[in-house]
Amino acid sequence: MTLEEELSRIGCISKSGVRVQNLAHLLNKETLKQCFHELDGSKAVGINKVTKAEYGKELDKNLDKLVSRLKGGTYFPRPSKRVYIDKPGTNKKRPLGMSCFEDKLIERAINKILVAVYEPKFLDYSYGFRPNRNCHMAISRLLSNIRGRTSFVVEADIRSCFDTIDHDKLISFLERDIADRRFIEIIRRELKAGHLEGNIYVDDLTGTVQGSGASPTLANVYLHYVLDTWFDDMRRRLGPEQRFRGVAGLVRYADDFVGTFQYEEDALKFYKELEVRFAEFGFTLAEEKTRVIEFGRFAQANLDERRRLGLTDKTQPDTFDFLGFTFYCAKARETGRFCVKVKSIGKRMQRKLNQIVAWIKKNRHSKLEVIWQHLNRVLKGYFNYYAVSGNSPSVSIFRYKIIRALFKWLNRRSQRKSYNWKGFNQMLESYPIADAHIRVDIYNYRR
């Protein structure tokens, strides 16, 4: 039986509700060799500085030794190397763990198995780090929820989610679904491996290592039980145990999530009980980023009424941010009816623009081919994500400002190489800049 057939079998067992057994035997030479060929050899190395190429020189011998240690219970992952990278959209740094290459093989194999076990169990609220799901699907689902009976939104943020996952509680969640002590023990050792901060060893008392091959799925398992199933239970209860009076929805992408509610009392109840629920499992809500707002088809009318009564000076309903976009209430141009629109978060767009302009300034003396290749690679990636329905003004302005910056800095190279706008536009015909046409219809997105 191939690995894919084994994983498919595991998925069927898991879907039936039976605890899955005999998983550790899949951490065999064949699986690890497949993981070896799948891993990117250009990634940073761990504390032992062994590269993929070096490990592969004696691949069979190395894998035989590794499998022997796994079977004998003597495999212990090395501490990861802690580095800090820029956190997208902010000025903050995000910790990242660099595992040794051999440990990356185990992490990747474990992740394959965990995905097979949990994909049949994960609920439809969850979109992050799952096969055949992405950010645009999460956004589309959220838009659909809001276009329904939503009148209130809970925008929430978990403070340092990945760093505060309780190891013992995570293991207990895994044991609900997996009846293989050896496999669970390997995961426990991965969690407890610690990391090096410079040359200083630090115990990992909580959290999953960001950068580990299994970390996203382990975090999804934790949030599945802490948030998703808990919310689903609240939403489905009827009769005397009914928790929500009206329609309620949830969309989660990794640790970012938004709750949508028909009634304010339900939104406030969810917010209040969420704090208690999270505290039980080691999570804390970032109060400055967590709030209940009125949002939906009646938000503008209700705001206008409060303004008429002199209760507020606001003219527009509150907005909220999710996955790089600002969501706001609007009216459809053709019908005048309520609709929800999205636009690029202003601060993030400006920060990205500043990065690109700084690159243009620094590299203005490079060959035009080099400049254009880099810019188009960056812009295509940016537009593939942000060029969605309704966001044409933001991405068009972004592109326009890049072109203006190009004109400015190419004219600073030398008098001999300077352009007027006519000459510059002629040059753009030979070296076109990626256009900002809409790539994704998020109102009718299908996976």
Residue ranges and their predicted role:
Residues 1-25, 30:
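Charged, compositionally biased N-terminal leader segments and the immediate start
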Residues 36-39, 43-51:
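Short, charged alpha-helical motifs in flexible N/C-terminal segments and linkers
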Residues 95, 203-208, 338-341, 357-371, ...:
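Short, solvent-exposed helix-loop connector elements
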Residues 192, 198, 285-365:
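A conserved non-catalytic segment of reverse transcriptases
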